[in-house]
Design a protein with these regions (language model features):
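Active-site mouth loops of central-metabolism enzymes
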Residues: 9-23, 78-86, 154-161, 213, ...
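Hydrophobic faces of well-ordered beta-strands that scaffold small-molecule active sites
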Residues: 3-7, 41-43, 73-75, 103-107, ...
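N-terminal small/glycine-rich loop or linker at the start of catalytic domains
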Residues: 1-17, 112-115, 142-153, 242-261
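N-terminal beta1-alpha1-beta2 module of alpha/beta enzyme domains
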Residues: 1-68, 72
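Alpha-helix-loop-beta-strand connector modules within alpha/beta enzyme cores
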Residues: 51-75, 129-136, 307-319
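Short, acidic/polar
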Residues: 20-32, 91, 161-168, 271-279
Length: 320
């Protein structure tokens, strides 16, 4: 299993630093993590978020490619219906050249009406359009059509699909599946086999929501507003009416009731290793990635989390 860090470059108002400094610091975190042994970094895409969420992952991938030499750099995910396939293919090929063959491209459908309106697109048929974009990327990148072409052939493509229908779609396309849902692995493998790709070509990857630390109880308390910010902004993007204060109150109530943050395990390194193994054992998992930072998370928590991921989790999980 290749272990990675997941970046969205959020820089929320309550904890914001100048954008130039924030981007530079994010690059420095990647450089340091590479030196400490991390296998990959993965980048997400959103638009119009109030905290400067990363809007152009492949542009940032090029910056990382120029400053690193070994880590793989993936997108998880780019919103396919907001991008022309030829434009995507050219960007991916150039990033692959800059990195000397270290790019992975994962695409998904998106869900935010505001994002689609920004690009003059409709949410209608977004699943079919994402399928078509993945197929066209395969043709453009592997067929020698875009110039200059990428280093890698075949080019590593992923579908950020969830649920049984998404697993079947990824299998039909013959691409990797960015989902660690154990219930869908067999559906994905069967679709690969049925469509001539071979079940042995199955590649799974995905995020595990997890923060690693020395003191889970104290760290959990400090993470409440940052988790609330992340959850509230995602909810608003999906059309749910919720304030930041409501999100904080809900998470604080859950923490008081259970002693745990809802949906975010905060664990010591040994417990974190056990969790990742439980999620991945017996599956054809190629990549697992954890958030590098959570919406303005304090620097000391970020630094210790990244240090423990690199020094304790990666060796235990047999990173490549």
């Amino acid at each position: 299993v290749k272990l990675g860090l997941f970046f969205d470059l959020r820089n929320p108002g309550p904890w914001a630093r100048p954008s130039v400094d924030h981007v530079a610091r994010s690059i420095d975190i990647v450089i340091g993590a590479e030196a400490a042994g991390i296998d990959a970094v993965w980048l997400s895409e959103h638009h119009l978020f109030p905290d400067g969420y990363l809007p152009q992952p492949l542009a940032f991938a090029c910056a990382l490619a120029a400053r690193t030499s070994r880590v793989r750099i993936g997108t998880a995910i780019m919103i396919a219906p907001l991008h022309h396939p030829a434009h995507l293919a050219e960007q991916a090929a150039l990033a692959d050249l800059i990195s000397n063959g270290r790019i992975e491209v994962g695409l998904g459908t998106g869900y935010s009406p505001e994002e689609f309106a920004l690009f003059g697109q409709s949410l209608d048929r977004r699943y079919g359009r994402t399928d078509a974009t993945l197929a066209e990327l395969r043709r453009l990148l592997d067929g020698g059509i875009v110039t200059p072409g990428p280093v890698q052939n075949p080019f590593p493509l992923w579908a950020g699909y969830q649920g049984p229908q998404g697993a079947a779609r990824a299998g039909r396309l013959g691409v990797g599946l960015l989902s660690l849902d154990r219930n869908n692995a067999a559906i994905y493998a069967e679709a690969l086999e049925a469509n001539g790709h071979g079940a042995s070509s199955a590649r799974l990857g995905g995020v595990i929501d997890l923060i690693v630390c020395d003191d889970p109880e104290a760290t959990s308390r400090r993470l409440v507003p940052h988790l609330a910010w992340q959850r509230q902004t995602y909810a608003v993007a999906r059309g749910v009416e919720q304030t930041f204060e409501q999100a904080v109150a809900g998470i604080e109530a859950k923490l008081a009731e259970t002693g745990r943050l809802p949906g975010l395990p905060v664990l010591t390194p040994d417990d974190a290793v056990d969790l990742v193994r439980k999620r991945t054992d017996g599956l054809p998992v190629e990549h697992v990635y954890l958030w590098a930072s959570l919406a303005g998370m304090p620097d000391d928590l970020v630094e210790r989390h990244v240090e423990l991921v690199c020094s304790r989790l990666r060796p235990a999980l047999g990173g490549a």
